[in-house]
């Protein structure tokens, strides 16, 4: 089976042969630098990696594509089926994280004047003199 792929298609599936690595990296570097590269490779120490035609781009269609659409589709179905049975890492449920503190809505009109606040609740509202920070950062104080 032969796999004919132009550089424009390589990014979509991520595959290329070792013979074309130099070309792919050159094209990708040109794209990254927003530079249009000529097809002719200048003489350099690495020219042998661009053999046999010593040009940057491979002409499209020089290898006949013998893969039918149904064959490619069946491979895709088989891959997706195999992926379904691969164990994966457990995921964390996405949910909104509440803030570190909670400020309840306090409406004096809704408070019952006949209900008293117990001593324990009042003690929780007192801020100690040796408390330097509002949160868990008080470990930093000495």
Curated annotation (Swiss-Prot):
GO terms for cellular component: nucleus
EC number(s) on file: 3.5.1.98
Function: Responsible for the deacetylation of lysine residues on the N-terminal part of the core histones (H2A, H2B, H3 and H4). Histone deacetylation gives a tag for epigenetic repression and plays an important role in transcriptional regulation, cell cycle progression and developmental events. Histone deacetylases act via the formation of large multiprotein complexes.
Biased composition (Basic and acidic residues): 113-130
GO molecular function list: histone deacetylase activity, hydrolytic mechanism
Organism: Arabidopsis thaliana
UniProt subcellular location: Nucleus
Region annotation Histone deacetylase: where it falls in the sequence: 14-34
Official protein name in the record: Putative histone deacetylase 10
Reaction catalyzed: N(6)-acetyl-L-lysyl-[histone] + H2O = L-lysyl-[histone] + acetate
Family that this chain belongs to: Belongs to the histone deacetylase family.
Residue spans of biased composition, Acidic residues class: 131-142
Keyword Nucleus: yes
Top-level division of the source organism's lineage: Eukaryota
Region named Disordered: 99-142
Keywords: Chromatin regulator, Hydrolase, Nucleus, Repressor, Transcription, Transcription regulation
GO terms, biological process: chromatin organization
């Amino acid at each position: 089976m032969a796999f004919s792929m132009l550089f424009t298609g390589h990014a979509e599936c991520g595959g290329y042969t070792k013979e074309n690595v130099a070309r792919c990296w050159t094209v990708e570097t040109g794209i990254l630098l927003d530079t249009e590269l000529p097809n002719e490779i200048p003489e350099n120490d690495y020219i042998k990696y661009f053999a046999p035609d010593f040009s940057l781009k491979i002409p499209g269609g020089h290898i006949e594509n013998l893969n039918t659409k149904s064959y490619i589709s069946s491979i895709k179905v088989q891959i997706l089926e195999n992926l379904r049975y691969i164990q994966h890492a457990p995921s964390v449920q996405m949910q909104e994280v509440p803030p570190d503190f909670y400020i309840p809505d306090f409406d004096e009109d809704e408070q019952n004047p006949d209900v008293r606040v117990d001593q324990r609740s009042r003690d929780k509202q007192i801020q100690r003199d040796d408390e330097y920070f509002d949160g868990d950062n008080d470990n930093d104080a000495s």
